[in-house]
Amino acid sequence: MPAVKVLEELGLLPSHARWLSAQAGNFLGGTKPRNLIEEMELLRDVLSEYWNQIAQRVEKPGNPVRVLVGPPGTGKTTALCKWMTQESLVNRKPVRVWRLDGDRGNTAEFLSLHGELMQIPVDRFWDDNDQPPEDTMRFVDLPGVAPNNPDALEALARGLADMPPLEIQLVLNASYDLGLLLRQVRAFSHLPLAGILLTHIDEAERWSKVWNVMLATQLPVSFLSGGQDIPGDFHRAIPENLFDAFVNAGLQTTSPAAG
């Protein structure tokens, strides 16, 4: 299918392109697209439906505690500040945050200062007996854990196992090389991850990286964050919009390397 070849030239990994071609054939149901535009529309539908299937598979019911984990320096705390600000100011939801220590101390003082500014409680210790009303958005900030530190990763898993139902978002820097991102996901794959939150999206050179990460890890990219301003650029990832951005931005470049 010519449209699949175009996506591969725009950065989709060859293995993903082959998978997409097969999926499109099954999705087609005997109706052959008449031109490249219709082929692109078909691929958009195939990828978006698959994305939503993955998201539904890992979705946590109810109102779980949202936990942000990831390597040091990926922008977890900034992303959390954006998220909690939007929930509080835009969505008018009650919010409470826990800034917890891990295998090392959590030095993100900025989170506590931002919480004070927003009049959002930021606690330093978790207490099962001190929980807010059920409609409260609960967030947990933890220190970054190096992917090459198995002891720290295991300690992280043990600490999270003692908490109530969680929605664990893995925070990664979208400007990093695709190979590094996939290695980082593998390092945290022992956790029941609910999705990936990509930061520094404004520095990412290619939107193909978002699709390659999703297809390689079988995890939805839940949120996208760009810049340092708060609340700034922080939004839920919509697959249809990301496909359009992938194609529109990719057609303006000429480099065929995957990323």
Predicted regions and their residues:
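Conserved nucleotide-binding/hydrolysis micro-motifs of P-loop NTPases
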Residues: G102-G105, G144-P147, A174-L178, I201-E205, ...
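Conserved beta-strand/loop subsegment of P-loop NTPase cores
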Residues: W19, P94-R96, P165-L172, S189-P231
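Short, solvent-exposed amphipathic alpha-helical segments in soluble enzyme
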Residues: W83, S112-E116, V185-S189, W211-A216, ...
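NTP-binding/hydrolysis catalytic cores, primarily Walker-type P-loop NTPases
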Residues: A3, L7, M214-G259
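Inter-motif core of Ras-like GTPase G domains
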Residues: K93, T136-M137, P150-Y176
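Conserved ATPase-coupling elements of RecA-like P-loop NTPase cores
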Residues: P147-L156, G179-R183, R206-K209
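Primarily NTPase-proximal linker/entry elements flanking Walker-type ATP/GTP-binding cores
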Residues: M1-V95, R99-A108, L113-P133, M137
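Conserved P-loop NTPase "ATPase switch" module shared by AAA+ and STAND
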Residues: D135-P147
